[in-house]
Regions:
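Short, solvent-exposed loop/turn segments that connect beta-strands within catalytic domains
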Residues: 63-69, 181, 202-207, 218-219, ...
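Short beta->alpha transition motifs characteristic of CBS
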Residues: 75-78, 161-165, 193, 210-218
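Catalytic nucleophile loop of clan PA
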Residues: 58, 176, 190-213
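Serine endopeptidase catalytic core focused on the charge-relay Asp
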Residues: 40-54, 68-69, 73-184, 202-204, ...
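Negatively charged
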Residues: 238-858
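C-terminal cap/linker of serine protease catalytic domains
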Residues: 208, 212-237
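N-terminal activation segment of mature serine protease catalytic domains
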Residues: 11-62, 72, 118-119
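PEST-like, low-complexity acidic/proline-rich intrinsically disordered segments
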Residues: 1-10
Length: 858
């Protein structure tokens, strides 16, 4: 088989041209070494069988890393990269009309290069060829053909074994041109179809100098590949990379690879970089290797990195390097044990060629290998040998353009113990086949598929072995396109963390097998089902939560959830956090928490907030809240409650009650509120806001000495007629009273005689639209020296008849607008000593006063 190229290239297998040269095979050359050579060639040369023809090959001993190995040599166009990639197939050769098979699924060294046009396959004992073949032997140190040809007979010969039942064929001629700096040389040895891949030797000393590869049209001569160049290629571990130089980028000191503590001695003095076959200056800067080159213009440049010594550790080798493509086809990684961080942060990398050829048989660590390769769309791991790998954490993390990982289903993961964040943020993956994953040793699956937003199917997830897994935190978090999930076979007996496990699986309608999960060792269930917004039913009847300490956000935003079976059986004796546990469960109507032990709970903030349809919480009246610190927005927007019995609530340690009952607009009574002591209370902002059906509040036991914010505390309590204990409230630390009683349109009387307002800076809207308010006792004692805003403070207090503001210090007030707007019933207004910061403010203030009002100014 001759080399086939298009008409623009120098090679051809146009046999009509060769026939014009009157090729004569098997001429009598008995005066030289042809007889001896023919006998040797019976065991040294073979036919390479192809589906579409045949070519030649030969066996040769070469020295590789101080070891002698036997190899089969031929052309790359005879044994192609495509043929080599089919590991389940064999390379077939014929020796003395006997067919032999070379298996590709066995670990062996293989080199191939389409530019140099050669393929070299190591022959090993399992091939059963070593006792049959008689390889050529070479001395790699004596090659200097360019000069030696002057001293030798330049007669050469090409040997082949071709065709059905044919013997060894010899094609002889002259070696015309050899130069040490070039890959190819010219010869006119007689050849026909099938000679490609045959050895070229000097007849004078039976010396191997090359491989026949084709025909040059221009000179009408045959071409040989200089064997010295092939040996150099094999000896040098070459990586090809492409970098892109942009106009706004510094064109000097460009980082192209890195070293680490384990490989710096292997790299030192053993690496060279070439651009257009010219050596480029290398600069070592700590762990970074850079090139110093004056690029004349922007564009893409291909560099060759040549390692003259094997590297055992490629950890971080190209981390954060400005590479757009890389070719590892000829990089020998047979001794590498660590590939962690190898391409981490290569965010311009679009292509990794030859990844399916690298030897990973000794690799132990692949953690973070492709992390943040955010421009990669495809990876071929078909022939990755991961049998020794124990770490795959963050392997593909944030490869957010990655659409396909070929060969994933064939990875040997039998020794892997860490898969944390393995596919996290692979937001373009739609399908994963893990059907052959052996996860029997895996301990960590935390965040394994998290943020795979387009993932629709994980084949094999129902059969993976999780018997040793300890961490499942966020394993399926934000898999927003998963519709089905079967965890029936999950063995979770050792798992201690299930936080965020199914969080934001927004299309998931059912989690098959959830009732079978063994949770006996789980301590964290935070956000476990958060925003599973399509799930209507959960069966937790077999959940053992005796060790769980955090169930905050557990069902948060499950807005279609109608029933949670087994909730009343959950053991919460060790739980300390229930923050937002049922928040936004807007379809739940009933909760049975009668067996909840809340004695250790510290946080109940937002626990039932926005449960819009919730009508009853059985057992809420038995809650032990003696250790609770936070009740912020606990019942916010529970606007279907009519009654709340909190008679068992101990609030002595609670510091935050902001929004606690906000928008509970059907609640008429909060039983037990009178017992609230709240000795540590700091915030009551909007605590009862929009409790629009509440008629009575007894806050006589409230200790508000530490409270700083009471703004909107009773805002929009339209039906509120009495606030018992308001006259005893300690407001000495309050800074904000904005809107505190706003729209309390049924309040007729307020006794604020004990209010200490010395630290208050905002009183805007404080009594705004208290439509029935007739008297505010103690208003004349207010200390307002720090207040800056009194906007609309008494606006539309339409029943207010007397106001004494003579002690008001408004020297710092910036806004008095609408302060007394529409106070239509005012009979007397005392503004004596009322000195506004701006006269215009005072003018505007009294402009709205009725003519019937007795105005005291001096």
């Amino acid at each position: 088989m001759e080399h086939q190229e298009n008409e623009n290239n120098q090679f051809t297998n146009d046999f009509s041209i060769q026939k014009e040269r009157k090729v004569k095979l098997g001429e009598n050359i008995s005066n030289d070494n042809s007889l001896l050579l023919s006998q040797k060639a019976n065991k040294s040369v073979c036919e390479v069988i192809r589906k579409d023809g045949y070519g030649s090959g030969f066996f040769c001993k070469v020295i590789f890393e101080n070891n002698e190995i036997n190899c089969l040599f031929t052309n790359n166009h005879v044994i192609t990269e495509e043929m080599l990639s089919k590991k389940d197939e064999n390379i077939e050769i014929k020796i003395n009309n006997q067919i032999y098979k070379i298996a590709l699924n066995i670990n062996r060294r293989i080199w191939t290069d389409s530019e140099l046009d050669f393929t070299c396959i190591e022959i090993i004992e399992k091939d059963n060829l070593l006792s049959i073949i008689d390889p050529f032997e070479i001395d790699k140190n004596s090659y200097n053909i360019e000069f030696e040809l002057e001293n030798y007979d330049r007669k050469g010969i090409v040997i082949t074994s071709i065709g059905q039942n044919k013997n060894i064929e010899l094609g002889y001629g002259a070696i015309l041109y050899v130069k040490n700096t070039e890959d190819r040389f010219l010869h006119d040895c007689n050849t026909v179809e099938g000679f490609s891949g045959g050895p070229i030797l000097l007849m004078s000393n039976i010396r191997l100098i090359g491989i026949h590869c084709g025909y040059e049209k221009e000179n009408k001569k045959n071409l040989g590949i200089y064997f010295k160049k092939i040996l150099e290629y094999i000896e040098k571990k070459t990586i090809k990379i492409s970098i892109e130089i942009e106009s706004n980028e510094k064109k000097e000191d460009i980082r192209i690879f890195n070293q680490n503590e384990d490989n710096k001695e292997e790299i030192k003095d053993n690496v060279k970089v070439y651009l257009n076959n010219k050596k480029v200056k290398l600069i070592n800067n700590g762990d970074q290797w850079k090139i110093n080159y004056d690029f004349k213009k922007d564009g893409i440049y291909e560099l060759k990195i040549v390692f003259t010594r094997n590297i055992s550790n490629t950890s971080g080798l190209f981390e954060k390097c400005n590479i757009i493509s890389i070719d590892l086809s000829n990089f020998d990684t047979s001794k590498v044990n660590n590939m962690g961080y190898m391409f981490n942060g290569c965010n311009k990398l679009k292509e990794i060629k030859g990844l399916n050829k690298i030897n990973t048989s000794n690799v132990i660590d692949m953690g973070v290998m492709f992390q943040n390769c955010s421009n990669l769309e495809y990876l071929d791991l078909t022939y990755f040998d991961t049998s020794k790998v124990n770490n795959m954490e963050y392997l593909f993390f944030s490869c957010n353009k990655l659409k396909k990982i070929k060969g994933l289903n064939k990875l040997n993961t039998s020794n892997v113990n860490n898969m944390n964040s393995m596919f996290q943020k692979c937001s373009n993956l739609e399908y994963l086949d893990l059907s052959n994953f052996d996860t029997s040793k895996v301990k960590d699956m935390g965040l394994m598929f998290s943020y795979c937003n387009n993932l629709k199917e994980i084949e094999g997830i129902n059969i993976i072995n999780t018997s040793n897994v300890i961490n499942m935190n966020g394993i399926f978090q934000q898999c927003t396109n998963l519709e089905d999930l079967d965890v029936s076979n999950f063995d979770t007996s050792k798992v201690n963390d299930m936080g965020y496990m199914f969080s934001r699986c927004e299309k998931l309608k059912e989690i098959k097998g959830i009732n079978k999960l063994n949770t006996s060792n789980v301590t964290i269930m935070k956000s476990m089902f958060q925003k599973c917004s399509n799930i209507e039913y959960l069966d937790l009847s077999n959940f053992d939560t005796s060790k769980v300490n955090d169930i905050s956000f557990m069902f948060n935003c499950c807005d279609k959830l109608k029933k949670i079976k087994g909730l009343n059986k959950l053991n919460t004796s060790n739980v300390n956090n229930m923050n937002s546990m049922f928040q936004n469960c807007s379809n739940l109507e009933y909760l049975d928490l009668s067996n909840f032990d809340t004695s250790k709970v510290k946080d109940m903030g937002l626990m039932f907030s926005y449960c819009n349809k919730l009508k009853e919480i059985e057992g809420i009246n038995k809650f032990n809240t003696s250790n609770v610190l936070n009740m912020k927005a606990m019942f916010q927007h529970c606007n279907n409650f009519e009654n709340l019995d909190l008679s068992s609530f101990d609030t002595s340690k609670v510091s935050d009650m902001d929004f606690m009952f906000n928008d509970c607009n059907k609640v008429r009574e909060i039983k037990g509120i009178s017992q609230f002591k709240a000795n540590e209370l700091v915030n009551t902002y909007s605590m009862f806001q929009d409790c629009s059906s509440l008629e009575y509040l007894d806050l006589s036991n409230f200790n508000t000495s530490k409270v700083t914010n009471m703004s909107n505390m009773f805002n929009e309590c339209y039906e509120l007629k009495e606030i018992k204990g308001i006259n005893k409230m300690n407001t000495s630390n309050v800074t904000n009273l904005r809107g505190m009683f706003q729209k309390c349109s049924n309040l007729e009387y307020l006794d604020l005689s004990n209010f200490d307002t010395s630290k208050v800076n905002d009183m805007a809207f404080m009594f705004n639209k208290c439509l029935k308010l007739k008297e505010i006792k103690g208003i004349q004692k207010f200390k307002t020296s720090n207040v800056v805003n009194m906007k609309a403070m008494f606006q539309e207090c339409k029943k207010l008849e007397y106001l004494d503001l003579s002690k008001f210090d408004i020297s710092k007030v910036d806004d008095l607008s609408f302060m007394l707007y529409s106070c239509k019933s005012l009979k007397e207004l005392n503004l004596k000593n009322f000195k506004a910061k701006k006269d215009s403010n005072k003018v505007n203030l009294i402009a709205f006063i009725s003519d019937k009002c007795h105005l005291i100014l001096e």
